[in-house]
Every structure is written in structure tokens, then in C-alpha cells.
Amino acid sequence: MAAREEVLALQAEVAQREEELSSLKQRLAAALSTGQESARSVPVSPLPPRAALSREEIRRYSRQLVLPELGMQGQLRLAAAAVLVVGCGGLGCPLAQYLAAAGVGRLGLVDYDVVEASNLARQVLHGEALAGQAKVFSAAAALRRLNSAVECVPYAQALTPATALDLVRRYDVVADCSDNAPTRYLVSDACVLAGRPLVSASALRFEGQLTVYHYGGGPCYRCVFPRPPPAETVTSCADGGVLGAVTGVLGCLQALEVLKTAAGLGPSYSGRLLLFDALRGDFRCIRLRRRRPDCAACGERPTVTDLQDYESFCGSSATDKCRSLRLLSPEERISIMDYKRLLDSRSPHLLLDVRPQVEVDICRLPHALHIPLKSLERRDAESLKVLGEAIREGKQGAQEGASVPIYVICKLGNDSQKAVKILQSWADLDSLTVKDVVGGLMAWAAKIDGTFPQY
């Protein structure tokens, strides 16, 4: 009897806790909604100079206050400094975390994106419970928990040519934690026009870079990169991958440069580029070209006098999301639903998976033949032999004289289109139908098999 009463009591307590949790979630949603509305009206006045630190602040920052290079005056400068963080992802999270911990007076947080499960391995301010919420509000809440004295101003929006210059002018130092060329050019041009130093970092795979632009007569981003790279040569973290600890290292180094700049110590990497190779454990530093007198942004006769359409300038989108290529006509593609119907009908065909081996190791469809895109691009003899044998085997299962269509799949439907173009150019396959599967395996996971891993 006692055991039964305990079970009933526990069940009642669980029900009560679930009701409390539901209420808390509703309050959180309301608070986030209110925050999104109030974020449009942000403080524009500069922070007042600080004459002294409180007793609590002295205790809190005591370990850095005793540094002769920083001291009381440097800490007072940090308390009166406003830093704009563009991007609350793998770089922006550790950067903002250390800026808040060090006592920077105001942090502006710019990001249009929401928290996703794939962010959590490297974006350390966000947690599982906030999936689907705006990154800037998740980050601001975490930073306030860390240091309630720091003013966090979230901007849940993309940085655009219409808003960037006004926003940059409200801050003393800007940190670029973005992951795309249009935003880098936009932020750099805005910093030049506003007269603000720019601390810029990037990370991909096991490598990272860090520099400071437009400081003390040093070069701006356009001085170093007058023309944007071809869009097809740019690899994002979503495409190429990145190790979370790499973004952590670069974000911390970025925070160090921001703190030195804001405290009046001067940055270490103005006119220099720090290169980090995590696999080798190496740090290298190279000197950048000097400020160009003919630079379109910061030169003697600049032509960039206001902000422009940077997506058109770069030929790519101002986002780190995977771009959807359109290399094929609709007739050369098949939807994931139509492919599933074809598969269920047991119609003879060959499914060719062109992802790299490292992605195939994560997940695959068991009936797919794997030949990486790179092997097709270089016409690898062994891969061609395997493909030829698979086509011949497919013909044996088809009606006499019938051809076996090839359907090409990858993660998202981009590399598969490139592969179709390659296969269409081969004379020995000109009699075969070759099509790309729209949306790739992520479409399969979303629309066909909810248990299929997404990565």
C-alpha cells in the first residue's frame, strides 16, 4: 500500500512539474516575442565615461586589474566601450562570452538565424532547450547570466546595406564573425565609412585566420581583397565542416584583439594575418599588403562612398547556408517523392551516390552505388569500371533492349547536378537517361524517412 501511495504521489508531482514547465515555456515565448519587438528601438547614445569602479567590480576584475598593461584606466575604458558582434555562431559565441566576462560595457549582437541542433557542437552560448529561438536572444540571455552589468543589445535581423552604417556608428569596435563574402565586404565598407576598427576572423575545417582591418593607417578588407572570389570556389562550414574547438580558439583570439583595442593597448594583428592550423598545432603570422592608395574604400580617392548591393558584387548570397544550385533543367531532375514511387515500383535503375566517403560513413541508402564526385571529375579508371559494371548488371534485370536510367544523389542536390553534367558529357553514356534527385538525402530524411540521419 505504501508503495502504491508513493507512486501516486510521484505521478502527481510529475504532473505538477509538467504544468509548471508548460507555463515557463509560455512565459519564455512571450518574453522572446517582446524582445524581438523591443530590439528595434535600441540605445543610440554612447556610454558615459567611467571615473571609478565599484567595490564589486574591483573584486570581479581583480585578476586583470593587476596587469600593469591594463590596470584601472584600461578597465574603465572597457566599461565605457561598445562592441558590435556580427554573427552569434561559432566565432561570435566565445568572442562575446569573453568580452562580457572582461567587463565590456555594451555588446551589440547581430544575427538573423535561429538555434539549430547542428549549431550546438561549436556555438557554446546556446543550449538544447532554445532550439528554434533567435540566436541573438539566446546569446543575450546567456551573457546576462554571466555578467548582469554588461548591456546586451540584440538585433534579430540580417545586416544589410540599409542598416549597417547606422548600426556600426553606434559602436566603438566591430567584430566580424560572419561566414560569407558579401557580409565581409559590407562590414568592412561600413567600418571605413564610420571610422571604426574591424577585428575579423574566420574558421573552416581545421584552420582559422585572424586580422584587424582599418586601424592606425592599416589596410581595410578591400585593400587585401579588391575583388571577391568566384562564388563557386567559396566553401562554407555547412559544406566543408569545422571543428568546434577551432572556432573557439579563433573566437578567443578575436576577443583578445577587441579587448586590447577597446582598452587602448592597440591590436597585435593590424597589417598582419594570423594563420592557425589545428591539425599541425601551428600558428603562423604573415604581413599583409599595406593600405592601397587606390583602394575603392579607404584610398586617396575612394569610389565607395555609400553601401552597395554586396550580393550582386560578390555573386553569392549573404548567408552561410548551403546555396541551391540550378545547373539542370526541370526535365533533367526528379523529385524525391517521384523517386520513392519509382523505387517502390521496383523499376530497374541505378542510384549513384556522389558524396565524399566521410559523408557516406555517416549515412547512406543501402541500394546506392557510391562513386565520389571527385572521382568522376578526374575520370578515375577504377570508378569508371565500377560504374560500367553496375550499368551492365542493371541491364540484365531490365527488359531486353531497355536502358537503365541513372539517378544521382548527394546531400542537398548540388553536387549531384555537377555529376549529372559530367555523366552527360561522356560519349559512352549518351544513350542513357541521367537525372539528379532534387534535394538529395536531406529531402529523403525530411519527406520519406524521418529516421534517416540529418547532418
UniProtKB/Swiss-Prot annotation:
<comment type="function">
    <text>Plays a central role in 2-thiolation of mcm(5)S(2)U at tRNA wobble positions of cytosolic tRNA(Lys), tRNA(Glu) and tRNA(Gln). Also essential during biosynthesis of the molybdenum cofactor. Acts by mediating the C-terminal thiocarboxylation of sulfur carriers URM1 and MOCS2A. Its N-terminus first activates URM1 and MOCS2A as acyl-adenylates (-COAMP), then the persulfide sulfur on the catalytic cysteine is transferred to URM1 and MOCS2A to form thiocarboxylation (-COSH) of their C-terminus.</text>
</comment>
<dbReference type="InterPro" id="IPR036873">
    <property type="entry name" value="Rhodanese-like_dom_sf"/>
</dbReference>
<dbReference type="GO" id="GO:0061605">
    <property type="term" value="F:molybdopterin-synthase adenylyltransferase activity"/>
</dbReference>
<dbReference type="GO" id="GO:0016779">
    <property type="term" value="F:nucleotidyltransferase activity"/>
</dbReference>
<feature type="binding site">
    <location>
        <position position="295"/>
    </location>
    <ligand>
        <name>Zn(2+)</name>
    </ligand>
</feature>
<feature type="binding site">
    <location>
        <position position="135"/>
    </location>
    <ligand>
        <name>ATP</name>
    </ligand>
</feature>
<keyword id="KW-0479">Metal-binding</keyword>
<feature type="binding site">
    <location>
        <position position="298"/>
    </location>
    <ligand>
        <name>Zn(2+)</name>
    </ligand>
</feature>
<keyword id="KW-1015">Disulfide bond</keyword>
<feature type="binding site">
    <location>
        <position position="111"/>
    </location>
    <ligand>
        <name>ATP</name>
    </ligand>
</feature>
<dbReference type="GO" id="GO:0061604">
    <property type="term" value="F:molybdopterin-synthase sulfurtransferase activity"/>
</dbReference>
<comment type="similarity">
    <text>In the N-terminal section; belongs to the HesA/MoeB/ThiF family. UBA4 subfamily.</text>
</comment>
<keyword id="KW-0548">Nucleotidyltransferase</keyword>
<dbReference type="GO" id="GO:0032447">
    <property type="term" value="P:protein urmylation"/>
</dbReference>
<keyword id="KW-0819">tRNA processing</keyword>
<dbReference type="GO" id="GO:0046872">
    <property type="term" value="F:metal ion binding"/>
</dbReference>
<keyword id="KW-0862">Zinc</keyword>
<dbReference type="GO" id="GO:0002143">
    <property type="term" value="P:tRNA wobble position uridine thiolation"/>
</dbReference>
<feature type="binding site">
    <location>
        <begin position="179"/>
        <end position="180"/>
    </location>
    <ligand>
        <name>ATP</name>
    </ligand>
</feature>
<dbReference type="GO" id="GO:0006777">
    <property type="term" value="P:Mo-molybdopterin cofactor biosynthetic process"/>
</dbReference>
<keyword id="KW-0808">Transferase</keyword>
<feature type="active site" description="Glycyl thioester intermediate; for adenylyltransferase activity">
    <location>
        <position position="237"/>
    </location>
</feature>
<feature type="binding site">
    <location>
        <position position="220"/>
    </location>
    <ligand>
        <name>Zn(2+)</name>
    </ligand>
</feature>
<dbReference type="InterPro" id="IPR001763">
    <property type="entry name" value="Rhodanese-like_dom"/>
</dbReference>
<protein>
    <recommendedName>
        <fullName>Adenylyltransferase and sulfurtransferase MOCS3</fullName>
        <ecNumber>2.7.7.80</ecNumber>
        <ecNumber>2.8.1.11</ecNumber>
    </recommendedName>
</protein>
<comment type="pathway">
    <text>Cofactor biosynthesis; molybdopterin biosynthesis.</text>
</comment>
<feature type="region of interest" description="Interaction with NFS1">
    <location>
        <begin position="156"/>
        <end position="236"/>
    </location>
</feature>
<feature type="binding site">
    <location>
        <position position="90"/>
    </location>
    <ligand>
        <name>ATP</name>
    </ligand>
</feature>
<dbReference type="GO" id="GO:0005829">
    <property type="term" value="C:cytosol"/>
</dbReference>
<feature type="domain" description="Rhodanese">
    <location>
        <begin position="345"/>
        <end position="453"/>
    </location>
</feature>
<dbReference type="InterPro" id="IPR035985">
    <property type="entry name" value="Ubiquitin-activating_enz"/>
</dbReference>
<dbReference type="GO" id="GO:0005524">
    <property type="term" value="F:ATP binding"/>
</dbReference>
<keyword id="KW-0501">Molybdenum cofactor biosynthesis</keyword>
<dbReference type="GO" id="GO:0034227">
    <property type="term" value="P:tRNA thio-modification"/>
</dbReference>
<feature type="modified residue" description="Cysteine persulfide">
    <location>
        <position position="410"/>
    </location>
</feature>
<dbReference type="Pfam" id="PF00899">
    <property type="entry name" value="ThiF"/>
</dbReference>
<feature type="disulfide bond" description="Alternate">
    <location>
        <begin position="314"/>
        <end position="322"/>
    </location>
</feature>
<dbReference type="GO" id="GO:0005737">
    <property type="term" value="C:cytoplasm"/>
</dbReference>
<dbReference type="GO" id="GO:0004792">
    <property type="term" value="F:thiosulfate-cyanide sulfurtransferase activity"/>
</dbReference>
<comment type="pathway">
    <text>tRNA modification; 5-methoxycarbonylmethyl-2-thiouridine-tRNA biosynthesis.</text>
</comment>
<dbReference type="InterPro" id="IPR045886">
    <property type="entry name" value="ThiF/MoeB/HesA"/>
</dbReference>
<keyword id="KW-0067">ATP-binding</keyword>
